[in-house]
Amino acid sequence: MSEVLEAHGKDPVAIGITNQRETIVAWNKKTSLPVHRALVWQDRRTSKRCLDLQKTDLLPFIRTTTGLVLDPYFSATKIEWLINEGEIALSPDVAFGTIDSWILWNLTNGSAFATDPTNASRTMLFDIERMKWDERLLNVFGITEENLPAVLPSSGQFGITSTSHSFAAGIPITGIAGDQQASLFGHAAFAAGDAKNTYGTGSFILMNVGQECPEPVDGLLSTVAWTIDNDGEISTTYALEGSIFVTGAAVQWLRDGLKIIDKVSDLEKLALECETTDDVYFVPAFTGLGSPWW
């Protein structure tokens, strides 16, 4: 960041953070050092735990409260795994956060421990209608609220940069949003019915559904698109999302794993040479399918 700012020649007026969403970092608040490797959004090590929970009465509660399905993709079982299998002893000094919280903590030298609803809504711990951490879900997964970040509006005051960085201190951090919601906003999808689809590692289609929390739709996720703080008046916009875990990553696998192509553009030539698939299809379910099958 310092190299980019130095080349620009001016300090920014404000900083915004966008990030991959469900990835979880655990760190010590006193030392600001991680206490375990991050568990990324594609990590499926808690699959059995999720299958066990699906046999309980928790499934409909999670669906209606968080807007999500019970899947290892989301952060709750990752945090639970870090506590139980990663042997992280809970204390007031332990912090769990998505990547935005970790970046914010470091940019402010530990003075700000916060997130926004677009990230909180991906943890499977957050009530997307009441806009708060859900006590029942915290108890189920053995997590205490003091170990989680405060949830602030997506556009608002999160803190200021500290003197511990090589660029100027005192730059306000005024926005946080998960990457897919930031993409929806960046494409000016401001009206209900507006949608975007991102093709990257996976593919993620989000549609703005307005300011009413949507009822669950089979195969899709209900999520927070963004919250806006307009001089103390908080407005929330919701979205429906379809998440496909592996699309572009499959092309990367063909290149780097199977090595059947040297560069991505070679794939088009191979595809055009094939007159028929003979009913053979490739389903890139390397980390599960995502929508609509889960």
Describe the residue ranges of each PLM region.
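Hydrophobic transmembrane-helix microenvironments that flank and shape a buried ionizable site
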Residues: 19, 40, 176-178
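A structural motif corresponding to the C-terminal end of an alpha-helix
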Residues: 140-147
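Short acidic loop-to-helix transition motifs that present clustered carboxylates
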Residues: 20, 153-160, 180-183
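Active-site core segments that coordinate phosphate-bearing ligands/cofactors
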Residues: 47, 54-66, 72-113, 119, ...
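Carbohydrate-associated surface elements
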Residues: 43
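N-terminal glycine/serine-rich phosphate-binding loop of ATP-dependent small-molecule kinases
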Residues: 1-36, 64, 93, 167-172
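Short linear loop/turn motifs
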Residues: 148-157, 268-272
